[in-house]
């Protein structure tokens, strides 16, 4: 073990292969192995969770038994307690996550409010920011699926794509501001391909009804 900073690895008993750098880094670690914690109070409450990596002030601060987490950026995964296999890359990523596992957030504020949602992927500033319990969502782009809270199985690619969806499930939004209007806030099983927040996208589909509308001419 290597400890640098006041109270770093302070409570360690049998844990091995740990690195704590910074005031109270890995302070409560007792038996956990192979954790790396760099930053003020990073992984401060970890006791038996192992194979975690934290870089930044308060990163993984509340983690106790969670394993295989990676938090890079101030406040990243700071509320995580027992959840595992999460990756937070950037300032304020996955801040409110407690027990949600297998989430990946890259970009400032991505998946900020996620608590118990699982298997979400957010790439971009504030992508899936308001998600709390929704699972199996993928948001790529600035504020993609930003307002989603409980909706699941959604895919959004593009700036503000699906940005007003809140509880809708199994939607696909592709393009700049695709589906970024209130008519899609709670919709399910929609396909929207557009380059604006129009209610008449170039391609408008419904997976459940197996229908597809093309708002334009099809040419060979």
Segments predicted by a language model, with ranges:
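Glycine- and small/polar-enriched repetitive beta-structure motifs of secreted/surface proteins
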Residues: 1-219
């Amino acid at each position: 073990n290597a400890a640098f900073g006041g109270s770093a690895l302070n409570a360690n008993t049998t844990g091995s292969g740990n690195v704590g750098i910074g005031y109270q880094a890995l302070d409560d670690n007792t038996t956990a192995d192979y954790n790396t914690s760099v930053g003020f109070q990073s992984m401060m409450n970890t006791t038996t969770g192992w194979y975690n990596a934290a870089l930044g002030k308060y990163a993984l601060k509340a983690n106790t038994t969670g394993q295989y987490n990676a938090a890079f950026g101030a406040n990243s995964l700071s509320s995580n307690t027992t959840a595992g296999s999460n990756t937070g890359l950037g300032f304020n990523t996955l801040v409110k996550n407690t027990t949600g596992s297998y989430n990946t957030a890259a970009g400032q504020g991505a998946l900020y409010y996620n608590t118990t949602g699982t298997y979400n992927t957010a790439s971009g500033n504030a992508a899936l920011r308001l998600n709390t319990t929704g699972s199996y969502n993928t948001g790529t782009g600035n504020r993609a699926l930003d307002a989603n809270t409980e909706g699941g199985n959604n895919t959004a690619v593009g700036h503000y794509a699906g940005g007003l969806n809140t509880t809708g499930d199994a939607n696909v939004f592709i393009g700049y501001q695709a589906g970024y209007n209130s008519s899609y806030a709670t919709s399910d099983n929609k396909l929207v391909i557009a380059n604006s927040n129009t209610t008449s996208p170039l391609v408008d589909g419904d997976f459940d009804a197996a229908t597809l509308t093309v708002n334009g001419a099809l040419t060979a």
